[in-house]
Amino acid sequence: MSTEFWIAQAFNGISYGALLFLLASGLSLIFGVMRIVNLAHGSYFMLGGYVGLTVALRTTSFTLACLAAAVAIALVGMGMERFFLRRLHGQVLGQVLMTIGFALIFQDLALLIWGGDPYTVPIPALLTGTTRLGGAVFPIYRIFIVGVATVVGLALWLVLDRTRVGAMIRAAVDDAEMAQGVGINVPRVSLAVFALGAALAALGGVIGGGFLGVYPGADFEVLPYAFVVVIVGGLGSLPGAMVGSLLVGLLDNFGKALFPELSYFTLFAPMALILALRPTGLFGRA
């Protein structure tokens, strides 16, 4: 196999990992703060793609599509947390059943509104085509995805590590009861984190819809990858989500390219090995 093959597969894996980071970072923070296993998180990705598709077709603005999807799905997430999931605090089975129910409802609503055909979110002409870097050819749109994920990752790091809001979020992740005891409004922090996680997933849905497409069932296809990222990286850890996304993207892409009949093994076997050595994940804490 040529050097170009390895470079192309590595870059494809990195760009897919960047997309997974948009989905998994919010999922990780939601679990870290609220201890909720949100099985409807993939639905935010799918619905974000559909909302972005609709706005992009009506306005021809990709930027507006991303913003509209993020805001709309953030409001959906806030409604779920405030009126449903908050009432099930500490009830893991109830949360799982509730979020599965929402995932199925969202999928049926998507089918009812947009039908069962696959769509591709229109992207700006500026992001189409390829460019040559160091003798290798790279799709411009995938470079854009890596850039967006990098900016989002840096912004999240700055907020979490350098601001008072970030300090409150980190306190809630470490010990919600203690944070509540020192005057932090944990329910409000939880609501904000849930909205942020939903918005990031929706942004990923719009951006992913530009090359993966938007279709019914996309939510359940991408959700297992997000959970693998969160489990490998460590629950509630932003650096863990970054590293986990990169690992999962590379393993999945190389696994499908080199061992298509064993692609799931090449993804889940390393996850099992990591958990055997570090049950809390690479960056998780007991």
Predicted regions and their residues:
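Helix-loop-helix "hairpin" substructures at the membrane interface of multi-pass membrane proteins
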Residues: 16-17, 22, 136-214, 238-243
